[in-house]
Structures are given as C-alpha cells and as structure tokens.
Amino acid sequence: MISLTALDLLDELLNDSSSNMIWLYEVYMLYKTYTSYFFMSSKSFVRGVKRYLIYFCYCANFIALFRVIFGTIFVYSPDGITPFMTDFVRWILIYLKGSINSLLYMASFTKQISLLRGWRTEHAELS
C-alpha cells in the first residue's frame, strides 16, 4: 500500500512540473517572437515584448519567493498546531498557488495576444 505522504509528494511534483513547463514554454515563445525578423520591423512591438519579458521575470520571481516563504513556514511551524490543521492549511496554500499560476498564465497569454493585435493594426496602418 502506498502511503499518503508519497502520493502527496507525487502530486506536488506533477503540479510543479506542469506549471514549470508552462512557464518555460511561455518564455520560449516570447524569445522566439522577440528574435523573429518578421516582428523586429516594428519598434513599438519590440518595446512591448521587452517590457513584457521584464514583467514576466518579476512574476516568476514573485512565485519562487512565495514558494520559499511558505516552505519555511511549514518547516518551522509550531508543534501546537494539530496535524489536521496543518494539512488543511497546506492544501489551501497548494490550491492558492495553483490558482495564482493559472491566473498569471492566462494574463500572460492575454497580454501576448493583445501585443500581437496591436502590432497587426499598427502594421496595417503603415501599409
């Protein structure tokens, strides 16, 4: 029989791996867009992508800091908290972390689409 702790660790590993893959894919797509010659012809688009990459790095650093802070809180939690309460708080934080990751991913995807739409309208006006 597999213990519940092992399943928790596997669940956490899969969740972290999937969110990290989403972040890496987003950075790769931004880099590919930024270095593409087709998009380099518009200076405002290049400025927007640079600014977006900076915001993206800030969000990734915030999430990493969030994980480190709550990881240390769980390691150094007082013994007075019951195991049920610790598990309950832990699951709430895992849910919040997943929600924040999903919201940031959707926001970054929406921002990328709006940048592309802005570039298309600007490019159409120039032609």
Swiss-Prot record:
UniProt entry tagged with the keyword Transmembrane: yes
Cellular compartments annotated: Membrane; Cytoplasm
Spans through the membrane: 20-42, 54-76, 91-110
Transmembrane helix is among the record's keywords: yes
Keywords: Cytoplasm, Membrane, Transmembrane, Transmembrane helix
Primary localization: membrane
Annotated membrane topology: Multi-pass membrane protein
GO cellular component, one term: cytoplasm
Name the UniProt record assigns to this protein: Uncharacterized membrane protein C18E5.14c
Organism: Schizosaccharomyces pombe (strain 972 / ATCC 24843) (Fission yeast)
